[in-house]
Amino acid sequence: MPAVTADTLTLPRIIDPRALGASERSVKSITMAPQGHEGEGFPVRRAFWGVPTADLDPFIHMDQMGEVDYAPYEPRGTDWHPHRGFETVTYIIDGTFLHQDSHGGGGTIANGATQWMTAGSGILHIETPPEALVVKGGLFHGLQLWVNLPARSKMIEPRYQNLEPNLVSLLATADAGSLVRLIAGEIDGHSGPGGTQTPITVAHATVQPGERMTLPWNPAYNALGYVLAGDGTAGPDAHPVSTGNLVVFNSGDSFTFTAGTSALELYLLGGQPIREPVAQYGPFVMNTREELQQAFDDFQAGRLGTVPADGLRPFRG
């Protein structure tokens, strides 16, 4: 169960767009995220696998980490690594992660918090489970999303936002059947706390068993829904969906999900497409091959930062 919950009867309501005659988005595609490993071997689902980049724009990459109940000494993280040219959005649904970067940032991401890092011109950072989770094991569930930056912003100064759970906008659908945790962007005039370089909306929704959730959505944005857990249907034609499915919607003013016999947990994404060339390799997302090569050269020369002398390291026991 997500760490952040609320009584939907007490929350601000999102208007049902059907009452306003909104055009509902049909389903364009449904894909299944394959399982793999990241960093030093922690399990992930590659949420965007097999989806055309034009359907994802301005999003680049997304991994679901867990949900997993780790045995002792099973948790793994990632050691220090560079990024340039995009933003990483790390959302910890349950559990705890430690992080640190070469610009003096660092801290703990836990139980509903989001770490929003704008890599911009370049940064080194590390994300790893704390010693207590490694030694004792325990529940861990999270997501990491990569958001592209337009060419004019790729070399901006790196920055970091720590979005604690109490900052997230908690909303309910008109019938109170769904909880929406608005992390960034806007839904029906309500705003999330995340400051974005690219116009986007990011939210985590819980649709209660048997309930239908229809959300208004910016018609200038694409619309993606990733199933974190549960099963149900998507769109006006009730396409079946389950854990690991990514739903891409066509154009329109709203979209719909309906939960099955258990709660349907959804990570909802949409943004204004950048529509610029993308040159990506490993931790760098630029516009040209020459810019990619420059990023590698700058990293090798230490121009993306250095690991602090007392820098965080993965705990291996």
Sequence positions of predicted segments:
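Jelly-roll (double-stranded beta-helix
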Residues: 1-317
